[in-house]
Structure formats: structure tokens, C-alpha cells
Amino acid sequence: MVVSKFVQIRRDLHKIPEIGFKEWKTQRYILDYIGTLSNEHVEVKVWRTGVIVKVKGKNPEKVIGYRADIDGLPITEETGYEFASVHEGMMHACGHDLHTTIGLGLLTAAVTERIDDDLVFLFQPAEEGPGGALPMLESEELKEWKPNIILGLHIAPEYPVGTIATKEGLLFANTSELYVDLKGKGGHAAYPHTANDMIVAASHLVTQLQSVISRNVNPLDSAVITIGKITGGTVQNIIAEKSRLEGTIRTLSVESMSRVKSRIEAIVAGIEASFQCEAIIDYGAMYHQVYNHEALTREFMQFVSEQTDMKVITCTEAMTGEDFGYMLQEIPGFMFWLGVNSEYGLHHAKLKPDEEAIEKAIVFLDQYVKWKGTRK
């Protein structure tokens, strides 16, 4: 079967997923592809494991930016693809291979037929962690080419191909990682009175955390704490000296995030006192909410609905986290969901996006960018 140029690019990228700030092969692939465009109006900068590309406009008055995240996830792939990951224990399970491919397609179209305004493409590492958007935004490499408008997309397995979904205002939640390390006194299982059991302490903590949302967050607001991993102990007959909880916090408002963290800290302090142990809280990476610029989003939705073949859906906000929110704090813009019709969802080992969505996205985004960046 003959596949299109950009489907092949997606498959090439799918084979080489890499985690945050280790995307060296992916960066090399992007740079090699850009090299084939060989256009005098293209400038390229390297930032860590990312790439920033500028296509000079014919008569620029503003800079339009497109951001694509490029990293993969530490997940063992189960798709059965012939082009499955060749990196053991790694997979593009969040669609960043599609995001990057669409960016390269849009870049190709921009070089082929230049618009009036400058275009800047941000191939950003480490969206899945520890977070590449904020340091890229603050980098010297980007300051010179900082966009006036920026857009980004994320694949949506639940929507059919040929649809996009977005909304004005809040789209994605504030998110924070959560790590709690407990240290007590280990001992023999036959003498529990001489030890401080950190398995029991961790169990109490998980249970108490369930009250944080239900009794501290306005029912008309929304927030969630998920503890996804607990570790502790060594063997079955030794009382654990240490335990560790790992999870996430997600809120729809900045105020709720602050309130939730305050309650977590109070509960952990209570665990310390009750179990005579030491506790350390680490919030790890935190991502700011994705808040779409109202006027630009409304304009985009209207254009896509009236001027392209894509169907536009007004969605509700999601508890998903995205470090693109940091870019939208400083640069007016928006993010949208791109339908890819997969039976399995994001971060699943069997995620199989419909590749037909790739060229549909390139075509309609090229239409939008040409309309937005060309003086009438």
C-alpha cells in the first residue's frame, strides 16, 4: 500500500518516541526534513532538544505561531503496528507524532506559498514532563521571534475524523504533580509496637485525601486528586520504614489549586503527628490552565465552520493538563481538539489514531493561516 508523504513522516516519528528533553532522534528528523525544504526565507534555531523555525513573510506586520509537542511516553506499545516503536518501553501514546507531522505539513505549505506575515513553528520538547513550554517561552532563542498570535492542537480519540472541538475561555485545567515521601521507623512484623509503619501511614493518607475535594472545593467548581502509585516496604515480614505516594491534582481555577494544596499540606502534617514520621511533599511539574482567547477562538471557529470542510463542535472544558497554557498566558491564541477516531484513548498502549486526520488538519490549518496572515 502506498502511503502519502505526511503519513510516512508520522510513521517514521512513531517508531522513535523519546521522553522529555531526550528527543535527540526526533530533533534530528525534524532538522533533516526542514533541510529538504532549502528555502531562502526559512530560518532555523535549535533550543535544547526542540526546534524553532521561522518562515519570513512577504510583508510582515505580525508573527503567527504554531506549536507542536514532540515527546513520547514511557509506555510499552500494544498497537500491533508494523511501524511500532523501536524504543523498548516507549510509545507515542498521546499523539505527539501527529502533532509534529501536522506542523511539518503546515511548514511545507508555508514555504511553498508564502503569506504576508511571518510564521514561527515551535517544535517543543517535554510536554509530558518536566515541561518544555515555559522554558522555551523564556528562552533567548524565542524572544526574537516571539509570536503575536499562537495556536496549538491536540488529537481527540473520541471525535470523528473531520471534526474539531474547542471553546472560548477555559479549555484545560490547572494541573500539578504530587509526590509525598513518608519516613518512619521500620521493624520486625512480630513487633509492631516498636516501629512506625509507613504502609499504614500511606493508607491513612490516601483515605484522608479523598475528603479534600468533597469538603473544600465549591460543588459548582471542579477539582480532582488522583493517587496513581504507592510504593513502600521490602518483604512481607518487615514493617516498612518508607513509603511514597505519587499522583496528580487538577483544578478548573487557580484559587482551587491553592486551596487544595493548602489542605493537602495540613493533612500531611496530621499524618506526621499521628504516625510520628517525617513527610516531604513535592509538587513536581505544574501546568497552567489552557485559557483560549475569546475573540480569536470565536473567529477561528467561525472561519473553520464557514470556509473549510471541517465540522466544528463547541466542547466543554476538560481536566486534561497541557503546558501550552503557559504560552497562552503571554501570547493571545487558542488550542483545539482534532478528531482522530480511535477506539482507545490518550496514554493507552493501543491508541491508534486514524491517519486520515493528518492531511485534513494540514489543509484546513493552511487555509486558516493564509486567511489570517494575508492582507486583503
From Swiss-Prot:
This protein's UniProt keywords: Amino-acid biosynthesis, Diaminopimelate biosynthesis, Hydrolase, Lysine biosynthesis
Entry EC no(s): 3.5.1.47
Disulfide bonds, paired cysteine numbers: none
Domain of life: Bacteria
Pfam families tied to this protein: M20_dimer, Peptidase_M20
Alphabetical GO biological process terms: diaminopimelate biosynthetic process; lysine biosynthetic process via diaminopimelate
Reactions it catalyzes: N-acetyl-(2S,6S)-2,6-diaminopimelate + H2O = (2S,6S)-2,6-diaminopimelate + acetate
GO molecular function: N-acetyldiaminopimelate deacetylase activity
InterPro entries: AcetylDAP_deacetylase, Amidohydrolase, Bact_exopeptidase_dim_dom, Peptidase_M20, Peptidase_M20_dimer
Function comment: Catalyzes the conversion of N-acetyl-diaminopimelate to diaminopimelate and acetate.
Protein name, per record: N-acetyldiaminopimelate deacetylase
Organism lineage: Bacteria, Bacillati, Bacillota, Bacilli, Bacillales
